[in-house]
């Protein structure tokens, strides 16, 4: 399986987590996903009254230097960590 297919598979797996990831984890995933699928940020930073959009933009901007492959790989790693954490908490 290629990196792109693995990435797409993990993008689906993350939707099936029974417990919602923390906001921090969601922002990390968002930034990596956008970097992997869109590339570097091309929009201006949202205003201070759009806190949610601003946080998402900041998360994307934070990974701006990563290549598509790096972002995909990091996204897969993060999803695996979340899946493992969920599995270990379910078995505990």
From Swiss-Prot:
An acyl-CoA binds at residues 30-34, 56, 75. Residues 3-88 form the ACB domain. Pfam families: ACBP (PF00887). GO terms for molecular function: fatty-acyl-CoA binding. PROSITE patterns: ACB_1 (PS00880), ACB_2 (PS51228). Gene3D superfamilies: 1.20.80.10. Keywords: Lipid-binding, Transport. Transmembrane segments: none annotated. Belongs to the ACBP family. Binds medium- and long-chain acyl-CoA esters with very high affinity and may function as an intracellular carrier of acyl-CoA esters. This is Acyl-CoA-binding protein. It comes from Brassica napus (Rape).
């Amino acid at each position: 399986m290629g990196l792109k297919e693995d990435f797409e598979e993990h993008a689906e797996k993350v939707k099936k987590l029974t417990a919602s990831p923390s906001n921090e984890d969601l922002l990390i995933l968002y930034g990596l996903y956008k970097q992997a699928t869109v590339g570097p940020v091309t929009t201006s930073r949202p205003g201070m009254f759009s806190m949610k959009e601003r946080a998402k933009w900041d998360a994307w901007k934070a990974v701006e230097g990563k290549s598509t492959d790096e972002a995909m790989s990091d996204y897969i790693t993060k999803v695996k960590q979340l899946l493992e954490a969920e599995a270990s908490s379910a078995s505990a």
